[in-house]
Amino acid sequence: MRSEGIYFFTMNENSITPPDVLDYWFSEKSKQFWFASTPQVDNEIKVRFESVWEKAAEGEYSQWRKTADGSVALIVILDQLPLNMFRSDPKGFQTESMAVEVALNAINNGFDEELNDEKLLFLFMPLMH
């Protein structure tokens, strides 16, 4: 099913990988909604990623912190996707502190030197709120 240019399907929280998240978030179709989302896109993100976000909030993907791309993927899940899934709800900020920890860990490990500009933007995003 397609809607507003984004493919609509759920992610399996048991088999999701950092490339799955990064391929989705950094696709040309998704980029157009980074800072100009719609209620429909927010709902699609919620349907697709809410169970993944819940697992991340429980620490399920903490091993992703060991790589640059894994760190960015985890930050997208913890920091960006909740803002869409829970717009105008304090729950959207529930995992922000976890995202800050991931970002600081990534910087301390020099991962910021491995990332392109777009990924670097989202690595630093939790530190800008």
Show where each model-derived region lies.
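Intrinsically disordered, low-complexity activation-like regions
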Residues: F8-V72, I77-S88, F93-H129
